[in-house]
C-alpha cells in the first residue's frame, strides 16, 4: 500500500509516540535558545512537573488539551517571555490557540505601561499552527530567529 505524505517532510511526525514528539519539542526549544535562557527558563514537558498547574493556568490550557507539549514561560512578571510547542489533543486546537493568544494579550497589557521594551517583545510574539496541527508560540527577544530555528528543528526531526 502506498501512503501519501503531505506537509513537505512533516508527515513522519504522525508516527511518533507522544513521548517522542515531546522530546522533539523540548530539543527544538533548547536548540533555539541561548545557554542563558536554557539555564534560567526551564522547559515544562510533563503535567507532573512542579510548575505545571500554574503554567497551564497562565496559558489557559489543561493537560487534557494537549497530546504533547514543551512550554517555557516566565512566571515572574518582569519579562515578556514564553515559548510553547504544543500538539493539541483531538478537538482542542481552538482551546490551545485561544489560550496562547490570551497569554500574549495579557502579557501585552502587563507591560504596556511600565516596561516599553518588554511590551515590544510581547507585541512581536508569534503564534502559528503548522501543517501537522502543532501550535508554536514564540515570545522572546529576537523572536523570528528563535521561531525559525524551532520550525527547522521540528521539520528536520
Model-derived features: where do they sit?
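Short, compositionally biased low-complexity segments enriched in polar/charged residues
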Residues: 44-79, 95-96
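A short acidic-to-branched-hydrophobic micro-motif
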Residues: 80-90
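Short Gly/Thr-rich strand-loop-strand
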Residues: 93-131
Amino acid at each position: 500500500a502506498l501512503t501519501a505524505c503531505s506537509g513537505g517532510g512533516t508527515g513522519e511526525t504522525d508516527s511518533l509516540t507522544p513521548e517522542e514528539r515531546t522530546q522533539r519539542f523540548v530539543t527544538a526549544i533548547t536548540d533555539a535558545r541561548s545557554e542563558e535562557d536554557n539555564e534560567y527558563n526551564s522547559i515544562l514537558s510533563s503535567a507532573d512537573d512542579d510548575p505545571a498547574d500554574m503554567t497551564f493556568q497562565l496559558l489557559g490550557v489543561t493537560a487534557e488539551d494537549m497530546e504533547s507539549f514543551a512550554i517555557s514561560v516566565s512566571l515572574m512578571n518582569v519579562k515578556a517571555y514564553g515559548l510553547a510547542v504544543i500538539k493539541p489533543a483531538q478537538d482542542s486546537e481552538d482551546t490551545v490557540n485561544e489560550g496562547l493568544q490570551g497569554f500574549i494579550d495579557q502579557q501585552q497589557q502587563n507591560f504596556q505601561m511600565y516596561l516599553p521594551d518588554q511590551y515590544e517583545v510581547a507585541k512581536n510574539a508569534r503564534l502559528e499552527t503548522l501543517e501537522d496541527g502543532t501550535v508554536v508560540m514564540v515570545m522572546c527577544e529576537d523572536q523570528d530567529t528563535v521561531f525559525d530555528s524551532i520550525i527547522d528543528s521540528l521539520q528536520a526531526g
